[in-house]
Amino acid sequence: LYDILSEGWDVVLIDSMAEVQNAIVDTHKGWMSSKKAETELLNLFEKHNLGENDANVNTAFLVIQQVTKGGEFAGSNRFKHMMTGMAHMEWTKEGERTFYFSKNRRGGDMSVRLFSLQNRNRVGWQGTLGVES
């Protein structure tokens, strides 16, 4: 992971934080706790986000995080704090797909958007929840 990231990437997708964190713990055969692995990952993300890699590229990380059965965020408060934004994809009771931000340090629209994946190779945005489209 360290070697690959050192090349410098515009965007890196992590699916999921828990899987990567557990892989690091497993690789270190018991001498690294889950909390320490999370700290290592967050420090690595921050380093590359600041462009501290061979290409001096400011890397954006899109990190998929699991939720509890109740739909609550399943990570640590430090993880939540270190993120620039937190987006959610959920189903409505009517079966529609939604996308919204609960945190966005860069500002912007925080409304709940409806979308469809019916068209091949294209996301169909269908309006904003609660607003006529």
Name each model-derived stretch.
Residues 1-100:
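P-loop NTPase motor core
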Residues 7-8, 52-60, 92-133:
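C-terminal regions of RecA-like/P-loop NTPase motor modules
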